[in-house]
């Protein structure tokens, strides 16, 4: 990021942010808390943009090994799930669970069916040095009919398994622990844990604290409050049970346990609102509150899994790499960023630490290769060894910082980053998550669509402010991944127009309308690498005169006649209005000027006042099957209201469609539906796109042209095809149609067995609901994409103003002209102060 300080504009921007945050509740914490969090958890707080990589900067050579899972290759598999049981200096032990494909049909005697005839429970013991499998132990052969393997752990040279069995006669569960020698497979010890509910709970994590081993399990009391049970094994093998429980407090997670010497340990426990700290006496099992001030400098929300080295150093993984804890100096130190190697970060970011030091480490775990068009859930187990290189192969290059929330990057984007870094002579992309801290927000009281939208607006407003301020001060990232929902940034002060790097594409080869609709005031700030479709999935015959959407009058008719008066858009008036406003925002804000005096603004407001419920239903009410049915299709977040009994639930659904599979599944669930229409508007416009993966480039980037080269890379045929075959809507028509044909073939075959409609009243599958798909359905989906009329990139700060100012009009307390004038003035001030 260029250090060009635009002082006057930055000063005005700070004033604008103060106004935006004032419109929010005090729940947040301001943009400052987002960009400069005082807690440390491994995430870097300062940009490295523009820094030149030196030869002695960290770089790690890697070796990736895929472990062959010992299953019967002659039997078709339903799924496998491998996971790490434990590791020491001799062996790595992996537990693989799963099932072979079971029979189907009415001729199966399910009452006497033994599921364990198809179960997979195998322990693989690998030599620590050679990585060869030296022993496989089949746990299924000794399982009782109603038993299953709950967990397995490997510590102190022995494997400990937990088997839980259900008793048909007493309707009770009992658990047995078994110690097994890893090489001979012989049983060393067996313990009946009885039918105590706590002792039957799954072991969640195992920690090594000095000479002690601590197993943790989460439980719930009669009031549904979560608490933890700790099983402490001392150096002599004696075991003690300790409860970590506090009245009225839900303890949801223990990410790590800190050894502080003298047989004492500190337990950080995540609750619904914050982190509590407890001191555990390992000798006598007593637990007391710890001094939080001694440990609250640690950001436990960013800690994923941990490893305690033989010297007592605690290393832990974060969303962007590996850090270690320095208790003495109360800080953490990043020793590895997932960018500092040649392995795709989307693979290694989900693995566990097997061992770690400053000079090398081992990650291992499940690698689930997602393929939406294959009927298989078989996972690989991989081991990746990293060793610090003698010199950095990218020395001399300058760093381009890519911001991604929580450091999340999918496989295709990850591959593109690696390709760019290998081919660029002058620049190196490094991913950070400096603005991902939303731990200040309380989600426990969210119980409706309105609640969720209000909180999302507040979070997005503060995220936008934090990014905008740092960009203007020359301290922000160069490339921004997936920030299309931060509409405030769509301004030449913050982002560059990417149109020159895309060029003039052929509309016959690309969905150029998607790029046009993504523009704001003629500029392409957010490049939609792939995208979703937002709208109302229904039958094309219900469309208004435009054929792609509804005017407010047409939707009112559709609502009252077809939907029997119950809207499928589950929002209250204020939130509903912001949806309609953002769908037509180019009518109300043009070139930084707000105008809410138009007939279009009045029409939307009057429609909402006359036809929309004041507040959205609570989720408690929605999930009451006497009142509402939640859609069971693949569409995320879709809801269908039952309304009166005569209302047909298969008429329409308001949803976000993520790909061809999602489109097909909605066709099946809502038999006869084949299109996605726009939400109510004044001109009957079509549905909107919402970027699923988007790229933006800062106006203050270290080198805009270098960032533009990365954007070009994402439009390449290989990337577009790979994204399309991962069930995403892409810009390339050829890639879209090629993936569509693969989807048609799959869902007309074995994939269709899992794509059936469900009766919303009973939740049971509907007979004969399977559909036969064809190339015509691909044509229909292509027409839907062509009909899209805008991009969802709302400005959260403006949303918050509209929610506050329009409410008195909807309640009948003020006239529309009055509230529109006030809202317009407030919005204009925000726009002016942004520059």
Model-derived regions, located:
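Extracytoplasmic "Venus flytrap"/periplasmic binding protein-like
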Residues: 434-510, 644-654, 666-667
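Helix-loop-helix "hinge/cap" segment bordering the ligand-binding cleft or interdomain interface
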Residues: 127, 131, 157, 503, ...
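Repeated scaffold domains used in trafficking and secretory/extracellular systems
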Residues: 77-86, 143-155, 195-210, 248-260, ...
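Short, well-ordered beta-strand elements
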Residues: 396-408, 427-434, 479, 525
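Hinge/lid segment of periplasmic solute-binding proteins
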Residues: 482-535, 673-680
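C-terminal capping/gating helix-and-loop segments adjacent to ligand/active sites or protein-protein/ligand interfaces
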Residues: 689, 752-827
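Extracytoplasmic/periplasmic substrate-binding proteins
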Residues: 611-709
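Periplasmic-binding protein-like
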Residues: 542-543, 564, 713-744
């Amino acid at each position: 990021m260029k250090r060009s300080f635009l002082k006057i504009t930055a000063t005005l921007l700070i004033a604008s942010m103060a106004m935006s945050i004032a419109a929010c509740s005090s729940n947040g914490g301001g943009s400052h808390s987002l960009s400069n969090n005082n807690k440390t958890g491994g995430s870097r707080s300062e940009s490295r943009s523009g820094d030149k990589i030196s030869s002695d900067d960290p770089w790690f050579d890697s070796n990736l090994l895929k472990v062959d899972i010992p299953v019967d290759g002659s039997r078709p598999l339903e799924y496998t799930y491998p996971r790490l049981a434990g590791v020491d200096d001799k062996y790595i032990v992996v537990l693989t669970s799963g099932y072979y494909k079971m029979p189907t049909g009415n001729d199966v005697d399910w009452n006497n069916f033994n599921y364990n005839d198809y179960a997979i429970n195998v322990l693989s013991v690998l030599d620590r040095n050679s990585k060869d499998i030296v022993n496989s132990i089949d746990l299924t052969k000794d399982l009782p009919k109603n038993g299953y393997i709950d967990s397995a752990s490997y510590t102190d040279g022995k494997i400990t398994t937990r088997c839980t069995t259900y008793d048909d006669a007493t309707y009770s569960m009992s658990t047995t622990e078994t110690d097994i020698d890893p090489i001979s497979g012989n049983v060393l010890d067996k313990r009946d844990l009885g039918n105590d509910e706590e002792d039957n709970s799954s072991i969640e994590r195992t920690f090594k604290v000095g000479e002690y081993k601590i197993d943790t399990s989460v439980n719930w009391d009669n009031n549904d409050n979560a608490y933890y049970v700790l099983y402490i094994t001392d150096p002599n093998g004696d075991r003690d049970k300790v409860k970590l429980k506090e009245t009225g407090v839900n303890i949801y997670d223990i990410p790590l346990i800190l050894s502080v010497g003298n047989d004492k340990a500190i337990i950080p426990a995540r609750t619904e609102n914050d982190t509590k700290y407890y001191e555990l006496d390992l000798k006598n099992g007593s637990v007391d509150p710890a001094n939080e001030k001694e440990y609250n400098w640690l950001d436990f929300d960013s800690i994923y899994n941990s490893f305690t080295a033989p010297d007592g150093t605690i290393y832990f993984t974060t969303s962007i790499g590996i850090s270690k804890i320095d208790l003495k100096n109360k800080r953490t130190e990043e020793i590895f960023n997932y960018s500092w190697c040649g392995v795709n970060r989307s693979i290694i970011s989900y693995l566990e630490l097997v061992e770690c030091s400053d000079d090398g480490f081992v990650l291992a775990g499940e690698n689930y290769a997602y393929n939406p068009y294959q009927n298989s859930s078989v996972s690989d187990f991989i081991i990746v060894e990293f060793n610090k290189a003698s010199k950095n192969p990218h020395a001399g290059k300058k760093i381009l910082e890519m911001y991604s929330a929580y450091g999340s990057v999918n496989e295709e984007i990850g591959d593109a980053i690696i390709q760019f870094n290998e081919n660029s002579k002058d620049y190196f992309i490094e991913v950070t998550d400096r603005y991902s801290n939303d731990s200040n927000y309380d989600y426990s009281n969210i119980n409706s669509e309105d609640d969720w939208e209000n909180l999302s607006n507040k979070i997005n407003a503060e995220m936008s402010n934090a990014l905008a301020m740092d960009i203007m001060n020359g301290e922000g990232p160069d490339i921004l991944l997936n920030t299309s929902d931060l509409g405030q940034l769509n301004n030449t002060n913050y982002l560059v127009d990417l149109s020159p790097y895309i060029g003039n594409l052929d509309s016959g080869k690309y969905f150029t309308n998607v790029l046009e609709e993504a523009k704001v005031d003629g500029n392409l700030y957010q490049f939609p690498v792939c995208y979703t479709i937002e709208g109302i999935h229904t039958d094309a015959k219900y469309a208004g005169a435009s054929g792609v959407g509804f005017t407010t009058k047409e939707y009112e008719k559709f609502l009252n006649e077809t939907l029997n008066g119950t809207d499928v858009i589950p929002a209250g008036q204020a939130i509903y209005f912001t949806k309609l406003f953002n769908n037509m925002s180019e009518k109300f804000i043009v070139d930084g000027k707000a105008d809410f005096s138009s007939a279009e603004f009045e029409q939307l407001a009057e429609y909402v006042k006359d036809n929309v419920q004041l507040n959205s239903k609570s989720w408690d009410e929605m999930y009451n099957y006497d009142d509402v049915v939640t859609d069971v299709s693949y569409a995320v977040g879709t809801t269908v209201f039952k309304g009166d009994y005569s209302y047909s639930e298969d008429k329409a659904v308001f949803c976000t469609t993520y790909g061809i599979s999602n489109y097909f599944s909605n066709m099946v669930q809502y038999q006869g539906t084949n299109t996605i229409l726009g939400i109510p508007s004044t001109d009957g416009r079509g549905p909107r796109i919402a970027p699923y993966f988007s790229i933006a480039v800062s106006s203050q980037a270290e080198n805009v042209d270098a960032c533009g080269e990365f954007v070009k890379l994402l439009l390449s045929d290989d990337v577009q095809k790979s994204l399309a075959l991962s069930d995403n809507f892409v810009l390339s028509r050829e890639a879209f149609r090629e993936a569509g044909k693969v989807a048609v073939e799959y869902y007309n075959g074995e994939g269709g067995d899992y794509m059936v409609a469900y009766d919303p009243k009973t939740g049971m599958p509907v007979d004969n609901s399977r559909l036969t798909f064809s190339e015509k359905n691909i044509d229909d989906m292509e027409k839907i994409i062509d009909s899209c009329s805008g991009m969802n990139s709302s400005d959260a700060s403006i949303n918050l103003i509209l929610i506050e100012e329009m409410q008195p009009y909807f309640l009948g307390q003020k006239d529309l002209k009055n509230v529109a004038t006030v809202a317009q003035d407030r919005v204009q001030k925000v726009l002016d102060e942004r520059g």
